[in-house]
Amino acid sequence: MAILGLGTDIVEISRIEAVVERTGERLARRILSPSEWQHYQQHQQPVRFLAKRFAVKEAAAKAFGTGIRNGLAFNQFEVVNDALGKPTLRLHSRAAELAVELGVKSLHVTLADERRYACATVIIES
């Protein structure tokens, strides 16, 4: 296996909170998959949840080397957790097509958060 891409992002949680306060659900609806949206609505700390998801999706867009454009959207990168809570990515629509085009075999996700920040790294392997 070879590393095809690596992306990291850090988000100041208060910035996400300010956007949510200003625009309501718009940001969450734009970046979350339908499944993530359900978790967001029920989460005890929805802004923190949203900030962490945003960081992962930004890191994924960087790892793919594309950013969010040319048919890619944040909600095409879905963060899912295994039984132990380990995060991974499920790809949809153009993101899934791009993964096939690039020969992606594995996606690795790590994420961390503290009081003020959420940080994520995504590694893509062939």
UniProtKB/Swiss-Prot annotation:
Mg(2+) binds at D9, E58. NCBIfam families: acpS, pantethn_trn. Gene3D superfamilies: 4'-phosphopantetheinyl transferase domain. GO terms for cellular component: cytoplasm. This is Holo-[acyl-carrier-protein] synthase. The gene is acpS. GO terms for molecular function: holo-[acyl-carrier-protein] synthase activity; magnesium ion binding. It is found in: Cytoplasm. Transfers the 4'-phosphopantetheine moiety from coenzyme A to a Ser of acyl-carrier-protein. GO terms for biological process: fatty acid biosynthetic process. Signal peptide: none annotated. InterPro entries: 4-PPantetheinyl_Trfase_dom, 4-PPantetheinyl_Trfase_dom_sf, ACPS, Ppantetheine-prot_Trfase_dom. Belongs to the P-Pant transferase superfamily. AcpS family. The keyword DNA-binding does not apply. Its main location: cytoplasm. The keyword Metal-binding applies. Keywords: Cytoplasm, Fatty acid biosynthesis, Fatty acid metabolism, Lipid biosynthesis, Lipid metabolism, Magnesium, Metal-binding, Transferase.
